[in-house]
Design a protein with these regions (language model features):
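Bacterial N-terminal signal peptides that target proteins for export
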Residues: 2-15
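Generic detector of short alpha-helix boundary/capping microenvironments
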Residues: 13-19, 102, 155
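C-terminal segment of classical bacterial N-terminal signal peptides
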Residues: 19-28
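Conserved functional micro-motifs across diverse proteins
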Residues: 31-213
């Protein structure tokens, strides 16, 4: 069920205030990574993929929704500039995410970047809580969502306007496996193909890095 704008904004505002207080505590280990993620053999700076190469896209009425994982094992396959941009974006919310993990007791998180773009004339509304990821037969909604652009909490877009948020999902969302992503009534299984491209790029990265030694 879609949370109404009037209900959602106070909830997110209150949660943000709580997280700000909690963020002074020690940071849990591996808070930003999915369970089992290992980047020790995957150096940064050797990838060649573009952000669109790892993005799942859905069309819902006037909205184009772009969803991509922020897991280090995935974004390290991107070109250096793209990797740096997404890595810094993820790190900008590290304190909030770590505080959320302490509060919920979860061992980690699967972090995702979700972008909404209005391609048509007039105003378009979006529902941040309607993004669902199916992993290993289970459906997951975001544990929390942090706006990355001014006005994200308004949940509306003018023509050609973009809004984006950082989504915190349960660590059981496994980016190394095929996933189904749904927004409202639209769904995509494209990650099953994209993850193969990511796997191939990982192998190439290790080869490139070995050649530099």
């Amino acid at each position: 069920m879609t949370m109404s704008r009037a209900r959602m904004l106070p909830v997110l505002g209150a949660m943000t205030a709580v997280l700000a207080v909690l963020s002074v505590a020690a940071r849990p280990a591996a808070a930003q990574q999915s369970a089992g993620a290992d980047t020790s053999s995957l150096p940064a700076g050797f990838g060649t993929l573009r952000q669109d190469d790892i993005a799942v896209k859905l069309q819902y009425n006037a909205l184009q929704v772009k969803v991509l994982p922020l897991d280090e094992t995935v974004i390290r396959t991107l070109s250096p500039d793209s990797y740096r941009a997404l890595h810094e974006l993820r790190e900008s919310k590290r304190a909030q995410v770590d505080s959320l993990l302490r509060r919920t007791g979860k061992p980690g998180a699967s972090l995702w970047y979700v972008q909404y773009f209005n391609q048509e004339q007039g105003e378009a509304r979006f529902s941040p809580l309607e993004v669902i990821i199916a992993s290993a037969g289970q459906d997951f909604r975001a544990v929390d969502v942090y706006g990355l652009t001014p006005g994200f909490g308004e949940q509306r877009l003018q023509q050609r306007e973009m809004q984006a948020g950082l989504y915190v999902f349960d660590p059981q969302v496994d980016v190394s496996q095929p996933l189904t992503i749904t927004y409202e009534t639209q769904r995509s299984d494209a990650w099953g193909t994209l993850v193969k491209k990511v796997d191939r790029e990982r192998a190439l990265i290790r080869s490139r890095a070995a050649g530099k030694e």
